[in-house]
Each structure stands twice: as C-alpha cells, then as structure tokens.
From Swiss-Prot:
It comes from the Bacteria. Its main location: membrane. Keywords: ATP synthesis, ATP-binding, Cell inner membrane, Cell membrane, CF(1), Hydrogen ion transport, Ion transport, Membrane, Nucleotide-binding, Translocase, Transport. It catalyses: ATP + H2O + 4 H(+)(in) = ADP + phosphate + 5 H(+)(out). F-type ATPases have 2 components, CF(1) - the catalytic core - and CF(0) - the membrane proton channel. CF(1) has five subunits: alpha(3), beta(3), gamma(1), delta(1), epsilon(1). CF(0) has three main subunits: a(1), b(2) and c(9-12). The alpha and beta chains form an alternating ring which encloses part of the gamma chain. CF(1) is attached to CF(0) by a central stalk formed by the gamma and epsilon chains, while a peripheral stalk is formed by the delta and b chains. It is found in: Cell inner membrane. This is ATP synthase subunit alpha.
Amino acid sequence: MVAKIQADEISSIIKERIDNFELSVDINETGKIVSYADGVAQVYGLSNVMAGEMVEFEEGTRGLVMNLEESTVGVVILGPGPLLKEGMSVKRLGRLLRVPVGDALLGRVVNALGEPIDGKGPIETTETRFVEEKAPGIMARKSVHEPLATGIKAIDALVPIGRGQRELIIGDRQTGKTTVALDAIINQKGNGVVCIYVAVGQKESTVAQIIRRLEDHGAMEYTIVVSSTAAEAAALQFLAPYTGVTMGEYFRDNARHGLIVYDDLSKHAVAYREMSLILRRPPGREAYPGDVFYIHSRLLERAAKVSDERGAGSLTALPIIETQAGDVSAYIPTNVISITDGQIFLETELFNSGVRPAINVGLSVSRVGGAAQIKATKQVAGTLRLDLAQYRELQAFAQFASDLDETSRKQLERGQRMVEVLKQPPFSPLSVEKQVLIIFAGNEGFFDDMAPSNVVRFEAELYPFIEASYPQIFENIRSTSKVDDNTNALMKKALEEFKASFIVA
C-alpha cells in the first residue's frame, strides 16, 4: 500500500526549514604579495588590517603586520620564508599574537612564538596571553622592598637587587655577564622564584651549553628558556624578549615571583634596526629608528613589584648590554641605563687581572635595592663601598709614591684582602649568612696578617668549620636577618678559634 503524501505536511516542513535557515558567510579579507625581500613582504589588498595583526601566507608561513602604508602593508615573516614570492595570496587571521603561559612551560625550551623546540613533546597548557601587554600603572605598583639574593658577594653586599627591580648587567664581550645572570638563576633554587632566560641572537651551541649548565645545577625545573638564535629571522629575535616577559607576567599576576634575564638587548636592538631599515623606516642616531628607546622601555616597564591588592607578586628583570671597548656612552647603553634602576658594570681589565666577578664597584649602582637589602648585610657591608673606592684611589697613588705612611699602607693591605674576599668562582652562589660571615671577617681584620693568596682557601675551609662547631651563627642570621651583639661576639670567637688552627701556605 502506497502512503499518501499530504500537501499541507510538505508545505509545513518547507516553511519550518525556511524559518530555521541561517545564511552563514565566512568573509575573509585577502591580499597579494607585491614584493618580498630579506624577511619582509609588501602586501596589497589588506585595507582593514590592524597594526600587529597576524596574517597567513598561502603556503602556511605566518607574518606580523608592522607597517601600515597608503596602499600596502609591511609584513615581517615569522619563520623561514624561502617559498614566498610575488603574487602569492595573504589572508588576515583577525587576531594579535598570543603565546602560551603557565606552569607547564617550566623546564622547557621554546622559540619566540612559544612553540617547544626541545623535543619533549607539546606543551600542555590552555592559557595564552597577548605578547603586547600594557605595563602596570603607578597605582598598581608597590615600592621594591624584598631582597632578591643573587648569591654573589659583590652584588648582594654592594649593589643589592630587590624583587621587582630592573638591574642592568653591562660590559664588554667575555667579561662574565651571562655567568652573573646564570648565578642569579641558580641561586633561586628553593626560593619559589620562577626564572626565564631569553637568548637573543646567540649561537645555538652557546644556548645548548647554558641549558646544560642549568640542568647540572637543578635549575631547569623552575626555569623557562626562550631562544631565538642568530640563525633565525630578525622578527623572531625582536619578539623573543616580549614572549619571555609575557610568560613572566603570568607568575607576577598570580601572586608569585619571577626573574627574567634578557641576553642581550644589544642584539635585540640590532635585530629591530635591521627590520626597520628593510621596512624603510627613517633611521636616526647610529642608524637605529627613532622608537628604539620605546621598544626597550615598554619591555622593561613590564617588570614590577605589584601592589597588595593585585597579589603582591613581582617580576625582576636583569637585562644584559654588550659594550664596545668599555664605551657606556653609546646610544643603546645610555638608553637602557636611563630606563633601569641601576647597573652592574663589568670590566675587561679586572677580569683579566683575576678579579672575578669583574665588577667595577665605583661605576656599579643599585638605585632602589638598598631598601630591599637585609639588615645583617647592611651592618657588615655599610662602609665597604667607600673602603674599596679609597683603596682604588690609594692604589693608583701608590704606583708613583715610593714611601707611604703607616695608615695608608694598612688601608692598602686591607683593601687588597677585601678584593680577595669578594672574589667568587662561577656557578657557586653563597647563602646570605655565609656572605655576612666572610665580609665581617675582612672588616674585623682577620686577614690583615695573612698573604692575600691564602684568603680564598681560608674562606673555603671556614664554612664547614662554622657549620660543624658554631651552627647557631648561621641560624641566628637566618632567623633574625641581623647581627646582634650575641652573634657579633660569637662570630669573633669562632673566627679566632678557626684562625688559630688554620695552616698558612
């Protein structure tokens, strides 16, 4: 039996379908490559594109819109672009650049786009953030008041760093700038500070060596490495520091503490200059574009100590700048010096003469770190900077003067020994209480009758002796963060006892 088709049923179904019909049209603006050279494409037809928007070329390469011109837009290529050529289509992605953030990144090595490059599989994180974020405003900040110990005697005593500070590490090539920064990262073990190391324009072998060094000291478990090597496009080298700081801001905004190292911003400025000149932006001093100050200030202002209302988290920045023949008055060094809260100046002459870390105490300064320094360090290192400055002056004078009075000679000898006290091998950070003890020993004249060559050995043998015989000294300094009369007397007693048993070579 054939079923009868009811006309009214058919009409009601058709009406229902018409009522529920949705016309969804995917409108996608596309353009064409007019010219392509040196990692920059001029694209025609993207009239509604935003500055900083992501675009995609027909063979899959992504780009970032940097220039908005009258008829074309300048797009920098994010990755290798050998297959790009004139006439290829380009489509808008309608979004700004975002990178993954979160705890899943700890222990990983990523590129400037936040993609893993360490062969350990994908990063399991769902949260992403815009690479370009506004820095916290004045009311969202709090003054720097908590110490960030680097474990380096010369820094913690003379140029202390606080959480939320920006402290520049500046010096010629091969003066130990990266070593100082890595020491600071290694010393954060067990302190709850997340570290981010951003390598800009470095050799791949150098980055691999740094990662191995961090792994050897157990520091990779709380560190993220963002690497954009010299072989990569200038656009990726330019983006890497912003990617790193975006990852650091996640911890800062979640009431945690972060430390970020930019190694180095000289190469970052060179990458930006290369990109800007190809985009035909007008060059200024040293051929850098006019906004080269702004690219560094907007980056470094994102490191901050945030207010209690926002969770009291912090992000501390250690930017590195490489100088040429010690010239700190060049364009980029003066820019970054004026942005940061102080600088640690490393000198080739000191490095070559065996003073390592090669910190020039006279030129190094921490503008806000003094408020964060613990009382115990302040007590023992209060006059150390002045004493060392007077020693340097006297040392220069002693080269020409044949005979010195007794006071000057003693000051010169004390200065020599204090320089020895501040020497420290790389990748061996010291706890605050050990620093306080050894500087106290120098100030109290325990090395005055000892050859300077014995000071380092004296220090190495002193710590195990104190831990075994006088552990309460370290306990007192750790618990009270100051040197009271009782601790002072105990330190003198312990040092006298140890010195009596110390065999001078």
